[in-house]
């Protein structure tokens, strides 16, 4: 008798580059679980509600959500976890018999790679590039799990950054939050930690510019910094290359990807992701891709 697998997937726009299917299918296969993870490309924000209604009808078990829909899906949820409600962004959805529950595991994906550097971050300014759902998760992670002296938000349009700052200040954020423009290189240089929470530098994403969020000749990056790039394809982005060239600590987006994926996997399946197996298999895949490119 045929036993249907439970379907999981990634909601996003032009996300064929994602390693999430490989990660989750590797984990499910290792544990012998009846899940299959795929990609659901949605072309525009206005199609998201009907897509999620269709998912309810089809009995799709759950989703990850990526750029640009982490905020869009919030209004479609029947319930929100405390962390998703706190930041107004969802990256993980559970379909519980037609009830959609939104979570945010990006926070875990940010905290886990940064934990070894907590003492470096303590009482020092930190910076985040971006004003979307990933940036919101970074603000929440840094303000609740670490003790920086302040969080600087670097954005292209200052009014959007100011709006985000107001949103967090209304929640009595325990750490000062300020808005700066992308060309404020002095403020960036003085940050102990810089996080790229934008898609800039992503390979194969038509909507994101190539290159680095920090220009190589800007003098921003130095050996006393931690550079965390949420972009994971390519594994070594131009920003991470710049970090390594200047002696800064470089944290690749793959670490965040695995961190948030492991938490999502546990929410869906009730099982701990076999992280060592997943990391080893992913590294093998990346090495193969690098050789063939």
From Swiss-Prot:
Pathway listed: Metabolic intermediate biosynthesis; chorismate biosynthesis; chorismate from D-erythrose 4-phosphate and phosphoenolpyruvate: step 4/7
Record EC number: 1.1.1.25
Enzyme class: oxidoreductase
Superkingdom field: Bacteria
Active site feature: 70
Keyword Hydrolase attached: no
UniProt entry keywords in alphabetical sequence: Amino-acid biosynthesis, Aromatic amino acid biosynthesis, NADP, Oxidoreductase
Role summary: Involved in the biosynthesis of the chorismate, which leads to the biosynthesis of aromatic amino acids. Catalyzes the reversible NADPH linked reduction of 3-dehydroshikimate (DHSA) to yield shikimate (SA).
Quaternary structure note: Homodimer.
Protein name: Shikimate dehydrogenase (NADP(+))
Organism: Chlorobium phaeobacteroides (strain BS1)
Lineage of origin: Bacteria, Pseudomonadati, Chlorobiota, Chlorobiia, Chlorobiales
């Amino acid at each position: 008798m045929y036993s249907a697998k439970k379907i999981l997937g990634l909601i996003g726009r032009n996300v064929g580059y994602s390693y999430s299917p490989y990660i989750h299918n590797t984990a499910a296969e290792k544990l012998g679980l009846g899940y299959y993870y795929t990609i659901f490309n949605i072309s525009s924000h206005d199609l998201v509600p009907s897509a999620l209604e269709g998912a309810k009808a089809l009995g799709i078990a759950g989703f990850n959500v990526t750029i640009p829909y982490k905020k869009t899906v919030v209004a479609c949820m029947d319930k929100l976890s405390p962390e998703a409600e706190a930041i107004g962004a969802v990256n993980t959805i559970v379909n519980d018999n037609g009830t959609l529950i939104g979570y945010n595991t990006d926070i875990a994906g940010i905290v886990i790679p940064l934990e070894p550097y907590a003492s470096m971050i303590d009482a020092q300014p930190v910076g985040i590039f971006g004003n979307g759902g990933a940036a919101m998760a970074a603000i929440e992670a840094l303000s609740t799990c670490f003790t920086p002296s302040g969080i600087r938000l670097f954005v292209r349009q200052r009014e959007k950054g100011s709006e985000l700052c107001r949103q967090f200040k209304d929640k009595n954020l325990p750490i000062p939050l300020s808005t700066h423009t992308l060309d404020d290189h002095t403020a960036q240089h003085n940050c102990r930690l810089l996080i790229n929470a934008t898609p800039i530098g992503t390979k194969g994403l038509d909507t994101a510019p190539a290159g680095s969020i920090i220009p190589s000749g800007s003098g921003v990056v130095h050996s006393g910094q931690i550079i965390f790039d949420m972009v994971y394809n390519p594994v070594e982005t131009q920003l991470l290359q710049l970090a390594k060239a200047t002696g800064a600590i470089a944290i690749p987006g793959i670490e965040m990807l695995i961190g948030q994926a492991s938490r999502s996997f546990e929410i869906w399946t009730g099982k701990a992701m076999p992280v060592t197996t997943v990391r080893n298999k992913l590294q093998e895949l990346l090495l193969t891709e690098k050789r063939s490119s």
